[in-house]
Amino acid sequence: VDAVGTACMLHSNIAAQYQSLRADFFAQPGVTRMTAAEHTEGDSRGTGAVGMVDAAAFRKNAGLKREVFGPFTLLVTCEDQEDLTRTLAGIEGQLTATLLGNEAEIQSASALVALLSEKVGRLLVNGVPTGVEVCPGMQHGGPYPATTDSRFTSVGTDAVKRWIRPLSFQNFPGGVLPPALKDDNPLGILRMVNGKMTTDPI
């Protein structure tokens, strides 16, 4: 990680907040700093950092469960599967979680999958969550405090639903309906009619 160098962050204030939180994490009891690279004061660039702590210390310290927005990783070491389960049960909502393993290993971890499904908005296998594609299948949200409303995504086709609400027009004459609802479909858009998606006029 030290050899990677720095990267420009989104804003100088974000870089300053990252530096502050990173320093605070490394000052916590039981946290071992695994990287040596330092951050340059006043610079908008972020330096990657890795810390390590054992699961018992992590569970006792709520401050270690905060998000550090930037190139920071905290490795939490667990003694066994029970220790891992206890630790994950105590974390709050997250945007993502990744499981690393082959198919047989993932199948044997069904209880872990079920636990993580309650904690995150996107669950990955052998992948990294940094690729946030704008597509219908993308879910970039999660239980609080990852987001304030876990029913929505902030990226992807469904993200627009954060800003709209359903409205039904019942028994309206066709001439006064909005264009998107007119029988002849003047906009040529895809609509659900009698349970089927179609662009055909009614």
Predicted regions and their residues:
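NAD(P)-dependent aldehyde/semialdehyde dehydrogenase
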Residues: 1-95
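Serine/threonine-rich low-complexity intrinsically disordered regions
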Residues: 2, 28, 35, 102, ...
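Generic surface-pattern signal
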Residues: 2, 6, 23-30, 118-121, ...
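Generic signal for short, ordered secondary-structure residues
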Residues: 4, 63, 142-143, 186
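Extended hydrophobic packing segments that form well-structured cores
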Residues: 177-202
